[in-house]
């Protein structure tokens, strides 16, 4: 009987050992299955994140193209600072240039490829870069005193035989530039003495003639410009007023001599 009891205990021990082994194997299998699921979850999550990033990049890309098109339609020539106001980065502008959608006119100014080119595109870029963050309509609404003047203004208004460039601009403050094709002169220009041409503030013929004298241009060319303007409705009274305002000293009066003679004021 004792021997039977011992055999029974030994059998139960073996059964318990088998149960433990099955439980251990089951636990290991469950753990491995859990690890596999976790790895699959991480991979799936990573794939979704990559797709999301790709989607966002594509959306940003098309958003930049749309914004650039809108800015170009509004401004024609536009600046890096104007683009930044529409959340268009420098990288996006550089990419558009490489892709052939944009043309770089000068440092910080662009135009859309395929649009009609104008002789004044470069001049427009230089003017906009004097206050790069503001749009043309904003500067037109609030006059800042910076205008195209002198020989450049005369060319734009077909007065005399002057070239468009080197470009000449007038500003109420001193503006320095290293660009050899652009010069600034410090002078006060009244808003009443400018006209907007091709999106640019240009001195009217009366003010342009006075500036040509102050810039020491050839007197014969000034008279030619005067005659051209006279045939297109020159405001001689306004011209007389401007000449008088700029003839306060003997030196200034000497500079104004071509116009004083033409107006019969000498």
What are these regions (language model features)?
Residues 249-266:
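Long hydrophobic alpha-helical segments typical of transmembrane helices together
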Residues 41-44, 48-66, 72-81, 85, ...:
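Short gly/ser-rich loop at a beta-strand->alpha-helix junction or flexible surface loop bordering the NTP-binding
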Residues 2-60:
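Short, intrinsically disordered or compositionally biased N-terminal tails of bacterial proteins
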């Amino acid at each position: 009987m004792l021997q039977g009891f011992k055999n029974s205990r030994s059998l139960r021990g073996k059964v318990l050992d088998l149960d433990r082994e099955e439980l251990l194997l089951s636990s290991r299998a469950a753990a491995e299955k859990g690890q596999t699921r976790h790895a699959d979850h991480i991979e799936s999550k990573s794939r979704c994140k990559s797709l999301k990033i790709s989607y966002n990049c594509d959306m940003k890309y098309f958003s930049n193209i749309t914004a650039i098109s809108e800015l170009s339609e509004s401004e024609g020539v536009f600046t890096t600072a104007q683009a930044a106001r529409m959340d268009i980065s420098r990288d996006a502008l550089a990419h558009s240039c490489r892709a052939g959608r944009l043309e770089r006119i000068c440092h910080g100014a662009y135009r859309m490829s395929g649009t009609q080119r104008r002789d004044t595109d470069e001049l427009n870029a230089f003017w906009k870069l004097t206050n790069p963050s503001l749009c043309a309509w904003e500067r037109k609404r609030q006059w800042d005193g910076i205008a195209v003047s002198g020989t450049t203004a005369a060319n734009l208004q077909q007065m005399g035989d002057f070239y468009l460039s080197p470009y000449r601009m007038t500003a109420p403050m001193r503006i320095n530039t290293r660009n050899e094709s652009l010069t600034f002169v410090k002078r006060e220009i009244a808003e009443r003495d400018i006209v907007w041409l091709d999106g640019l503030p240009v001195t009217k013929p009366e003010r342009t003639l006075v500036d040509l004298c102050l810039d020491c241009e050839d007197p014969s060319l000034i008279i030619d410009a005067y005659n051209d303007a006279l045939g297109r409705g020159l405001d001689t009274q306004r011209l007389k007023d401007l000449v008088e305002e700029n003839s306060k000293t003997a030196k200034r009066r000497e500079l104004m001599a071509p116009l004083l003679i033409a107006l019969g004021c000498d």
